[in-house]
Amino acid sequence: MVSPVTVVKSEGPKLVPFFKATCVYFVLWLPSSSPSWVSALIKCLPIFCLWLFLLAHGVRFLLAHPSASLIFVGLVFSAVGDAFLIWQDHGYFEHGLLMFAVAHILYAAAFGMRPLALRTGLVIGVLSGLCYALLYPGLSGAFTYLVGVYVALISFMGWRAMAGLRLVGAAWRWTELAAGGGALLFILSDLTIALNKFCFPVPYSRALIMSTYYAAQMLIALSAVESREPVGEDYRLSKAD
């Protein structure tokens, strides 16, 4: 098991560009009412930095570990989804929804199906059903089905992220904690989007959505550093190209 102190020392410097790009987004705070390619670039920049964060561990690392590669591709789809959502009021919300749906499928595949953790899945399934029931009165047309499918996909991703989470004992791994925390924050971010769009105005919605979203993506990217595939001895942070 890698200690949190080792994680901070090893991975912290690689995340500096991400933190700087996130600060740029919040400092500039470009108005969402005036979408442009500049605002799309500023919004996507932190995700681009997470691409670089994973690439900093070496292309051979990504090629050797399918879970890390899946998370990287998921980040690519997320950036495309972010760009689409810049123009969501111009008919591109569904496009963004599709991109993030694909990202969640990729993340779920990266987290794997072992252990199964059926009880965790049942709890998440019930909670996601309640969330959809809350959203349902505000949905109409195709969104009635699109949002339902999206809720199912992000809930499945959350289940797989938290299935292997162990907080005590020798089997504890910080990467599983990062995956579980990232999934929870992603669900919170997207639930806020849905409530704000379909149900009622959420105070400070944009700040809440983007802060939880960037934190979620960072944690999910961080979870890829220690591979989930057994390759001889456990993969350690010292491995780099």
Swiss-Prot record:
Expression sites (tissue/organ): Highly expressed in the jejunum, white adipose tissue, kidney and macrophages.
Side of membrane Extracellular, spans: 31-36, 88-96, 137-142, 196-206
Subcellular location: Endoplasmic reticulum membrane
GO BP terms: lipid metabolic process
Membrane topology: Multi-pass membrane protein
Pfam family, one: YhhN
EC number, as in UniProt: 3.3.2.2
Hydrolase in keyword set: yes
Effect recorded for H104L: Reduced lysoplasmalogenase activity
Family matches, as InterPro entries: TMEM86B-like (IPR012506)
Record key words, sorted: Endoplasmic reticulum, Hydrolase, Lipid metabolism, Membrane, Transmembrane, Transmembrane helix
Induction, as annotated: Sterol-inducible in the macrophages and the induction is mediated by the liver X receptor (LXR). Up-regulated by high-fat diet in the white adipose tissue.
Catalysed transformations (reactions): a 1-O-(1Z-alkenyl)-sn-glycero-3-phosphocholine + H2O = a 2,3-saturated aldehyde + sn-glycerol 3-phosphocholine; a 1-O-(1Z-alkenyl)-sn-glycero-3-phosphoethanolamine + H2O = a 2,3-saturated aldehyde + sn-glycero-3-phosphoethanolamine
Sequence ranges on the Cytoplasmic membrane side: 1-13, 60-67, 114-119, 160-176, 226-241
Residue stretches spanning the membrane: 14-30, 37-59, 68-87, 97-113, 120-136, 143-159, 177-195, 207-225
Gene Ontology CC: endoplasmic reticulum membrane
GO molecular function terms noted in the UniProt entry: alkenylglycerophosphocholine hydrolase activity
Gene null: resulting phenotype: Adipocyte-specific knockout mice show elevated levels of lysoplasmalogens in adipose tissue and enhanced PKA-signaling pathway and mitochondrial oxidative metabolism in adipose tissue.
PANTHER family cross-referenced by the UniProt entry: GH04784P (PTHR31885), LYSOPLASMALOGENASE-LIKE PROTEIN TMEM86A (PTHR31885:SF9)
Recorded family membership: Belongs to the TMEM86 family.
Protein function: Catalyzes the hydrolysis of the vinyl ether bond of choline or ethanolamine lysoplasmalogens, forming fatty aldehyde and glycerophosphocholine or glycerophosphoethanolamine, respectively and is specific for the sn-2-deacylated (lyso) form of plasmalogen. Plays an important role in lysoplasmalogen metabolism in the adipocyte tissue and macrophages.
Designated name of the protein: Lysoplasmalogenase TMEM86A
Organism whose genome encodes this protein: Mus musculus
Gene for this chain: Tmem86a
